[in-house]
């Protein structure tokens, strides 16, 4: 059984037992988090939401809060001696999918 959930402005296909990385959620490590925006549930019986499936939830356990690899953004304007260098690390949350309730 699998489901498609929406979190952080993205749609993610998940299965039970799968580990996923999502945009940072405001929860502590070890807590459980429930996704209510389930767009699709597949498996033996298929349920398609319009826009979400009524009563369907996906429960996950928070494994880790972290930050991704650093990217460097460098901008400049030619012949003007104007340049700027910035770094960015995107925060994320690592989850393990426990149960898909449909």
From Swiss-Prot:
UniProt xrefs under Pfam families: Ribosomal_L21p (PF00829)
Region of interest: Disordered: 80-102
Biased composition (Basic residues): 80-91
InterPro entries, per database record: bL21-like (IPR028909), bL21-like_sf (IPR036164), Ribosomal_bL21 (IPR001787)
GO terms classed as biological process: translation
UniProt-recorded Gene Ontology molecular function terms: rRNA binding; structural constituent of ribosome
Keywords: Ribonucleoprotein, Ribosomal protein, RNA-binding, rRNA-binding
Keyword Electron transport: no
GO cellular component: cytoplasm; ribonucleoprotein complex; ribosome
UniProt family annotation: Belongs to the bacterial ribosomal protein bL21 family.
Record's function text: This protein binds to 23S rRNA in the presence of protein L20.
Description of how the protein assembles with itself and partners: Part of the 50S ribosomal subunit. Contacts protein L20.
Protein name: Large ribosomal subunit protein bL21
Organism of provenance: Staphylococcus aureus (strain NCTC 8325 / PS 47)
Higher taxonomy: Bacteria, Bacillati, Bacillota, Bacilli, Bacillales
């Amino acid at each position: 059984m699998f489901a498609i959930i929406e979190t952080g402005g993205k749609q993610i296909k998940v299965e039970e037992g799968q580990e996923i990385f999502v945009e940072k959620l405001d929860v502590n490590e070890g807590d459980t988090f429930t996704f209510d925006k389930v767009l699709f549930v597949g498996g033996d019986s298929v349920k398609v939401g319009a826009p979400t499936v009524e009563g369907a939830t996906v429960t996950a356990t928070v494994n880790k809060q972290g930050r991704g690899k650093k990217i460097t953004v460098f901008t400049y304007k030619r012949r003007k001696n104007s340049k700027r260098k910035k770094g960015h690390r995107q925060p994320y949350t690592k989850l393990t999918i426990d149960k898909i309730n449909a």
